[in-house]
Amino acid sequence: MAASKITLVLGSHAHVPYGADTCEFETMYADLLRPFISGLYKYPKIQAALHYSGVLLHWVERSHPELLMLIEDMVGRRQIEMLGGGFYEPMLPIIPLQDKIGQIELLTTYLRKQFGKRPQGCWVPAFAWEQGLVSPLAACGMGFTFLSDRQFALAGGDAGGYRAPCICEDQGKVITVFPVLQPLETAVGEKSVSPLLAALLEDFNKRSPEETEFIVSIFPRKINAGKNESMDYAWNRLFEDLSLCEHAETAVPGKLLKGLKGLPKLCFPDSSDTAESMSSRRFVIVHPEAGGIYSKMVFTNVLINQLRGDKSRKLSAHEELWKAQGSALFCMTGRQGLHNHLLRNAAYSALLGAERITREKSKFVPSLVPFDFNMDGAEEWLFQDARINCYAQSAGGGIFELDYLPKAWNYMDTCGGRNAFADRLLPPSYKIEDLVFGDIGGARNCRTEHYDMGDLDKVRRKLILLLRGSSVKTAPFGNIEIEKKYSLKKDTVFAEYVFANSGAAKELFTFAPEIDLALPGEGEAFTRFFACSAQADTPLAQPLFRGADGLKIHDLKNEVQITLTANRPFDGKIVPVSNGETGEELYQATCIMPIFSVSLEPGEKWGVEFALKFSH
C-alpha cells in the first residue's frame, strides 16, 4: 500500500549574528519574519515549526513586539512549535560542553518565559554535526533535531534517495533526527508548491511502494517575488497554494515524534550543511582570524573556570563568553561571516567583557607569562596589565593580540594573521610612494621567519626576541641580525630594536615595519590621524608624512587616542587593509608603516625604540 499523502514538516529558520548592523535585522524581519508569521497566521490549519535564534528573538522583542504576540497566539492554538537550540546560534562542535548546555538552556528558558512551553526539539546551527552532540542535546531535554538529506546520504540512509527519520545514539543517550530536503526548499522558493509535492509523492511511491508514510521537512528561507509583488504577497501565495494542496498535510515534529516507531539507527559522520563547507575545526586552522577568536574563547573559558565561590559572577562571565561563539564566525567568510569586522569586534568585546568580570573584586597583578595560547605546540608570551593585554609570538616576532580593556577592544583584530611590528628590510632605493603592506619582492620579509627567545624577565616584564642571519646565502639582507625587546608599562607598549651587520660588507637598507591596527572603520567618521612634531600636531590629509616625531590616532568610536612615537624622526605611510575574497572589499584594519634609512658597516649596530600608548 503506497503513501496517500506527504506528511510535511514546514519550518522557518532565521538568525542574524550578534554584533551585526541593525539594517541586517530589519532586512531579515521584512523579507522573512514578518511575511512568514503574518501569512501563516491567516491559515490556522497549516502547522509549522519555527526556529529563530535568541539574538533575533531578543531584537524582535525590543523592535517589533507585535510579532511575538502573533507567535504566542499560534503556539497557544497549537499551530506552531518553537524549536530550541543555542541562544547565540553557536558552533556547537567546537565549544566546551558546559557552554553547549548553557546556551541551550538559555534559549529554552527564554522560549518558556515568552511562549509558555519548553521546546522538545532543537536546531543545529549550520547543520554542523558531530556524533558527540547527541549526549548534551539529550541532556537538555531535546528529543529531536534536523540534518540535511546530504548528511543522511553520508550516514548510509535509504538508498532509494528519500530519507526517513532515524535514531542517533551517543553514550547511551538517543535523539531522533529528521531529514531536511534541501532541493525541495530551493524549488519551493521558485515554483508553485502543489505540483512539486505531487511529483515528489508520485516518485516516492514508485521507489518505495510498500511504504505508507512519507515525512518531508523543509525550512524555506527565501521566496521569489514576482514583478511588483511584495514579499508579504509572495509568502501568502505559498500558504494559499499549500492550503489547497491535496498531496500533503502539515504537522509539527513534536507531535509526529510520539507516533514514530521502529526507526532505523544511523551514525552521522562529522559534517555540515553543504558539500563545499569545511568543518569548523578545519575552518579555525585555515583562517587565522577565526583561530584567534577560538583561542581567545578557550583561554577565557580557563579564566572563568578558575573563579571560585561566586556563582553569580561566574554565570555573568559565561553569558558574555557565549556571545562570541556564533557559528557565522566559524563557517562563513565575507560580509555574512568572518570578514565582517563588526562581527569580530563584537566577539572580542564579549570575550574581553568576560575577562574583565573575572578580574573584578580582586587586586590584579600585572604579569608576563609564557603560554601556548594558539594551541600550536609553541609558547607565546602574554603581557597582562590592568588596562592592556599584549600577546607576542615567535612567528614573525610580532604582536598578534593587543587588547585595550577599558573599551573592550582588540586592536589586533585584523584579517589574515596580520600583526603589529612585523619587520621588513627593503632595498635602499625603495620609494615611500610605492610602499605597500605585505610581502615585497627583493625585500627580507621577516614576518615569515622564526624569532628565538633571547631572554624572558618575568619580574621586569621584558621579552627579548632574536632573529639570526638568514641561512639562505642569497637571501636579501641575510647578514642582518635583529634583537627586539618588548615591554609593557601601564598604558604603553614598548618595542626596542637593535640591528647588527654580521657580514663582511656594508649593508644599506630601508627598515619599514608594519603596525596593523584594527580601527572601527575607514575614513574621518571613524578615525583621524595627526603627524606629531615639537611644534604642533598636523592633521593628515594624505597617507604620507615625513620627518615626524610621532603619529596620533583618534579612534572616534571608542574615544581612544593612540600615540605612536619613536626616538628618531621618521617618514611613514598609512594604508587601509581590505579583504576582497568574496568580490566585495571589506575594511579590516589600517596599516601604519614608519620608514627609516639604515647604513651598517660590518660589525656595526643601529637601534630604534617605539612606544605605542593608549589613553581615553
What are these regions (language model features)?
Residues E26-A30, Q98, G102, A386-V459, ...:
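Acidic-aromatic substrate-binding/catalytic surfaces of carbohydrate-active enzymes
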Residues D491-F494, A500-G572:
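Polysaccharide-binding surfaces and accessory modules of carbohydrate-active proteins
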Residues Q98, K113, R118, W123-C168, ...:
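Gly/Pro-rich turn-and-neighbor structural signature
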Residues K5-P96, Q103, Q120-V124, G143-D149, ...:
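Short, well-structured secondary-structure segments
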Residues P370-D372, R447, L456-G478, T492-F494, ...:
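Beta-strand-rich recognition/accessory modules
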Residues A2-R34, Y41-Y43, Y162-I175, L181-P183, ...:
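Active-site and substrate-binding clefts of carbohydrate-active enzymes
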Residues L97-A126, A199-I218:
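CE4/NodB-like, metal-dependent polysaccharide N-deacetylase domain
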